[in-house]
């Protein structure tokens, strides 16, 4: 969708971004901001001789350290952090979203997602981001700073079974949500 289409979709209530700031609308995307939560894997919770996390045991939440972000935080090289967007989004059943990194962060070696950049039709909630620092130096982040962008595409028809049905494990997620692999 173009900026005009995005603004119209939000104005009609068909697409929801909350809180919404029109200044964050770009020519064909919306910049989303860093929320106030981060979860980091604690090395003392990684078990086994080979340092393997068994994701089939549980949702992984006890392997993660929770931090409420009130001030800047630093991601060191080689670090993986689950964070969240400040905004909650609600995608209509005839649209999909794609979360992409911002080039300003990519040029510092930061990726904002590993594989989970696709947002299904019908999804509602905050978007969990999978930040990694692939660069040579630590990078500082401020809660509320623009961290990623979301691009929207209209489908030719609404999804028959949009996200949000009883098997949708991340629907209405709030905060940095760990893997639900053990529920697959």
Across the structure, where does each feature detected by a protein language model lie?
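DUTPase catalytic domain/fold
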Residues: 1-184
